[in-house]
Amino acid sequence: ELDVLYLVDNSNVDNSKFFLNDKFEYIPLLKNTGIAHALNVGAKKALDSNYKYLLTMDQDSKFESDALKNMKNIIDNDIDKDTVGIYSPFHKTAISDPVPSELFTSPLVVMTSGNIINLDIYKCVEGFKEWMFIDCVDFEYGLNIRKHGYTIKQINTVFLDHELGNYEIKYFLNKKIFCDNHSALRRYYIVRNSFYLYDLYHDDFPDYCEAVKRQAKQSFFYATVFEKH
């Protein structure tokens, strides 16, 4: 279903010998420059090759059978596609909500993996913010395209299996607590970038930004009290 696959490798090792295929374009960065930079590298490669759409994937996700083909067919037949900045599948995780009954829903933000982004709109919003490095990069991009008047469509008949990593479920005052067990550095980026989102978009999306701020404080508390260090 893909014309070309860009493999952006942000490890410090050149793994090109494993990707000798005409449909692969392997791009070694030879250091971890952050998820936002890696996404921009792939997007600019696609733009240089005159592609209109880019599928973004994480290493911990996979589409269910024929899902990508179905997603492409739905997009091709969507009369609103020129104003849709992101088409997203339904992300199936250990903690995901029930699948909506509608074909399309319009979440305010979506996770990166499995998205098909409109590259004309990507250029309009000037891509992903590289100074964020990791965490909230995808949410910032979603808010940015919405601030510019574009939309996000989640296709609820297309499923992506997404692993959440080393999470645990614990209980506090009869309440279920999800602990993600991130490193201290990763926790720093989560909290820092959550507050950046608040500063950048509170005027446009106040309810969401207040929730992000609360969640950042809550996750820091859970990490301090419940997670192993």
Task: Name each model feature, range by range.
Residues L2-P28:
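Acidic donor-binding segment of Leloir-type glycosyltransferases
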Residues Y51-D60:
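Short beta-strand-to-loop acidic/aromatic patch adjacent to the donor-nucleotide binding site
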Residues D66-V99:
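Conserved donor NDP-sugar-binding/catalytic core segment of glycosyltransferases
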Residues T112-E126:
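Conserved nucleotide-sugar donor-binding
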Residues D199-H229:
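Non-catalytic, C-terminal membrane-associated alpha-helical segments of glycosyltransferases
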